[in-house]
Amino acid sequence: MGYTKAEILKALKGENVKFLRLQITDILGVVKNVEVPESQFEKALDGEIMFDGSSIEGFTRIEESDMLLRPDYNTFVILPDLVEDPKRGRVARLICDVYYPDGRPFEGDPRYVLKRQIERLKKLGFDNLYAGPEPEFFLFLRTPEGLPTTETHDRAGYFDLAPIDKGEEARRDMVNALVAMGFEIEAAHHEVAPGQHEIDFKYADALTTADNIATFKWVVKRIALNHGLHATFLPKPIRGINGSGMHTHLSLFKDGENAFYDPNAEYQLSQTALHFIAGLLEHAAGMVAVTNPLVNSYKRLTPGYEAPTNIAWSASNRSAMIRIPARRGVGTRAELRMPDPSCNPYLALAVMAAAGADGIERKLLPPPPIQRNIYQMTVRERRKHKIRELPGTLREALEALRKDPVIREALGEHVYTHFLQAKQMEWDDYRVTVHQWELDRYLATY
C-alpha cells in the first residue's frame, strides 16, 4: 500500500505512536535503526535525519561519514503489540534509503544495489522481477542467563503437530505479528530437523521481498525471545541434521504476464526463462559468496541433506541447484535452491537479478535439464553432463566472486570491495582458529 506524508502523520497521531524507527541494513544484512521521538516525526519523513555512516559495516570512512535517511513511505507500518510492548509507547517503522548530504544515493546502500538491478531488468522491457522466499530457521532453548544454546526445544519432524512441536505457539505468534504488519502468510510448519521451522509468505516484487525478508528475520527473533527461545538463521547449527535454506522462487513479468511461460515450448518454458536460467547457472559460483555468505553456509551445502552441491537445473529434480516447480501459467518460476537465510536479502536478490539479466542480454541457453538424482551420479557421469560443483568453502566462493566481473559490477565497486574484505577477514579468522574437532581428533594421539 502506498502512503503519503500526510497519511503517515495522521496515522502516527491517531494511533498514539511515540517512536518512529528508521531502518536500514549494513552490507552483511544486519538490520540497523535510528529511533526518533514525536518531535522529530516530520523531520524524519522529510528525509532530514542524519547518521554516522562510518559506524555501519561497509558504509563510509570516518572523514566522509554524514549520511541521510530517506524513508520509503511504502514500508510504513505500526508495530503490533506482539513485537513492541505498547506500555513503553507505540512504535512505527519505515525502511530507508541512504543518501549523501548533497542528495546523491549512497552506492554502498544494499537497497540501492538491488534497485540498480531492477532498473536494468526494466530497461530490458520487463515489468519487474518477482521473488518468493522460503526462509527456514531453528528455535533453540536459552540458558537461565538468557544466552542461546544449540539444544532444540522439541524432537519433532516435518509437518508434525503439537504437543510434539513445542514451537507451535511461538510460530503462531510470529504469523499473527507478521500478518498484522501486512504480510500475506501462505504456510507455517515444522521442518525436517528437530527445532526447525518454516514460514512462507507470498511472493512480491524483488524490492518488497527483500524488505520483507529483513523484516521477517528480526520479527521472528523478537517473538522467539518473548517465548524464552532463541531463533537463529544460521545455516547449519547442528551437525548430522538438515540445515536451514532459503529457496527463492524467481519469475519475470512483462506487460502484466509471466514472461517465463510459453504454452507451446518444451517444458512450457519461454526463451526468456531459459536465458534467465542459463544466466543463473553461468554465475552460480560467482554469486554463492553473496547468497551463502558465512563459513558455516558451506556445511549446509553437502550431499545428503537436501541442499544442492552441483550447478545444474531440472524440471522437477530437487537435487539440482535450480528446480522448475510443476505449476505453469502465472505461476511459472525457477526455484534457486542454494541460498540460505543468513544472506543480505538485497544483495542476494541483486546478484540473482544480474545473473539472469546477463543470460537474457547474451541469449545464453542452459544445457539439457538433469532428471536423475545428482547425488547418486558418479564423477564420470557428472563430467559427461558438464555438471560443475558449487564452491565447497567460503574461501572457494570468494575466489569465484573475484573471477566474476558480472557479479562484481552488480554489487558496485564500493560494496564489492567492502564485502570481499569483510568476508576474507572472516575466513582468515576461521582458518587460524583451533576448533574442538581438532582437539578431539588429535590431542590424545599426537
From Swiss-Prot:
The keyword Nucleotide-binding applies. The keyword Membrane does not apply. Mg(2+) 2 binds at E136, E191, E198. Its main location: cytoplasm. Transmembrane segments: none annotated. Residues 15-103 form the GS beta-grasp domain. This is Glutamine synthetase. The lineage of its organism: Bacteria, Thermotogati, Deinococcota, Deinococci, Thermales.
